[in-house]
Amino acid sequence: MAHPVQLGFQDAASPIMEELLYFHDHTLMIMFLISSLVLYIISLMLTTKLTHTSTMDAQEVETVWTILPAAILILIALPSLRILYMMDEITSPSLTLKTMGHQWYWSYEYTDYENLCFDSYMTPCSDLKPGELRLLEVDNRVVLPTELSIRTLISSEDVLHSWTVPSLGVKTDAIPGRLNQATLMASRPGVYYGQCSEICGANHSFMPIVLELIPLKHFEEWLLFTL
């Protein structure tokens, strides 16, 4: 989860989020090198008295500044496309979770089981227990197993919403009349928080998402207790 005055990403808890962090560092390093080169050239131009006013063209320089940016863009595009296809690929999911956005709460349905569905509202500040987080706790958490591929089907009953859990690298728009899908797989147990990330009205800030990821054995016990 996020912390006050946090500047970086949340700790990755899924393979996809780890790949996104690697890609971020990769791209940031390329940008840093380009910025350093540009600053060096600017400082060189400001400090030297040498000029070439009679130069009309320079084929070598033009070739370099055409090929070099193209190569840099390829170095950025290839890892990006790889992650894009990884996020879109859903093969043999172990569980399917249907998520519907409402003004201003979420409803969930475990489509693999009968009558396992519930609404998830934000817990009011007056009902918070010691240690619970303001504006992030809900009355019904989504319980899912770890280390299993889970497909989420996401849509909306009214306006645009966005189902987002940063630690798991998931952010999918909930669009009325359209069913989007995403895949998630947690690499370790824990409680992961998210929020609606699409402005959806007056109470947009009060649509938290809480996922409780537990080992498969405990998930089966939870199913027996719930059903």
UniProtKB/Swiss-Prot annotation:
Cu cation A1 binds at H161, C196, C200, M207. It comes from the Eukaryota. It is an enzyme of class 7 (translocase). It is found in: Mitochondrion inner membrane. Binds a dinuclear copper A center per subunit. Keywords: Copper, Electron transport, Magnesium, Membrane, Metal-binding, Mitochondrion, Mitochondrion inner membrane, Respiratory chain, Translocase, Transmembrane, Transmembrane helix, Transport. It catalyses: 4 Fe(II)-[cytochrome c] + O2 + 8 H(+)(in) = 4 Fe(III)-[cytochrome c] + 2 H2O + 4 H(+)(out). Mg(2+) binds at E198. The keyword Mitochondrion applies. Belongs to the cytochrome c oxidase subunit 2 family. Component of the cytochrome c oxidase (complex IV, CIV), a multisubunit enzyme composed of 14 subunits. The complex is composed of a catalytic core of 3 subunits MT-CO1, MT-CO2 and MT-CO3, encoded in the mitochondrial DNA, and 11 supernumerary subunits COX4I, COX5A, COX5B, COX6A, COX6B, COX6C, COX7A, COX7B, COX7C, COX8 and NDUFA4, which are encoded in the nuclear genome. This is Cytochrome c oxidase subunit 2. It comes from Varecia variegata (Black-and-white ruffed lemur).
